[in-house]
């Protein structure tokens, strides 16, 4: 089964959106496999966003991520990477549809509440970074009611 990495950014945590966001993924039928509330240091944030290090917004992004606690999660389910991105909405909240997390709760691209993996391979890499000890291996009793 496919897994994805989802992170509620400091503005999402400070705004009290953790439960709402978890609920949206659970209601879709995805299984929560890993969860951490933590404040990351600069070196870790730079490693997480290494693919963006040449971008002009990189330093601001890193400062934002280390500014407060984040919630790091691993979700599992059929097409969870693609569907997770649809639940989240466009990177720019102004382009996010109502009903998406960013469409409902974010205004500015620089404070867009949540991060989600964009591909299965990048999810695998980031999950290894954030959860080197691994994640919970369990199956919901609802699986037969959700998946064919």
Curated annotation (Swiss-Prot):
ATP binds at residues 9, 57, 85, 91, 102, 112. InterPro entries: NDK-like_dom (IPR034907), NDK-like_dom_sf (IPR036850), Nucleoside_diP_kinase (IPR001564), Nucleoside_diP_kinase_AS (IPR023005). GO terms for molecular function: ATP binding; metal ion binding; nucleoside diphosphate kinase activity. CDD domains: NDPk_I. The active site is at residue 115. Keywords: ATP-binding, Kinase, Magnesium, Metal-binding, Nucleotide metabolism, Nucleotide-binding, Phosphoprotein, Transferase. It holds the Pfam family NDK. One of its GO terms (biological process) is CTP biosynthetic process. It catalyses: a 2'-deoxyribonucleoside 5'-diphosphate + ATP = a 2'-deoxyribonucleoside 5'-triphosphate + ADP; a ribonucleoside 5'-diphosphate + ATP = a ribonucleoside 5'-triphosphate + ADP. Its EC number is 2.7.4.6. Gene3D superfamilies: Nucleoside diphosphate kinase-like domain. Belongs to the NDK family. This is Nucleoside diphosphate kinase A. It comes from Flaveria bidentis (Coastal plain yellowtops). The lineage of its organism: Eukaryota, Viridiplantae, Streptophyta, Embryophyta, Tracheophyta.
């Amino acid at each position: 089964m496919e897994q994805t990495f989802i992170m509620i950014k400091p503005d999402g945590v400070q705004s009290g959106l953790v439960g709402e966001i978890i609920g949206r993924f659970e209601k879709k039928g995805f299984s929560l496999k890993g969860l951490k509330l933590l404040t990351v240091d600069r070196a870790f944030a730079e490693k997480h966003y290494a693919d963006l290090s040449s971008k002009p917004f990189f330093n601001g992004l890193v400062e934002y991520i280390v500014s407060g606690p984040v919630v790091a999660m691993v979700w599992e389910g059929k097409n969870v990477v693609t569907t997770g991105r649809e639940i989240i909405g466009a990177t720019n909240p102004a382009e996010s549809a109502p009903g998406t997390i960013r469409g409902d709760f974010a205004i500015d691209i620089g404070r867009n509440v949540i991060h989600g993996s964009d591909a299965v391979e990048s999810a695998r890499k980031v999950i290894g970074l954030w959860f080197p000890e691994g994640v919970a291996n369990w199956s919901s009793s609802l699986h037969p009611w959700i998946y064919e």
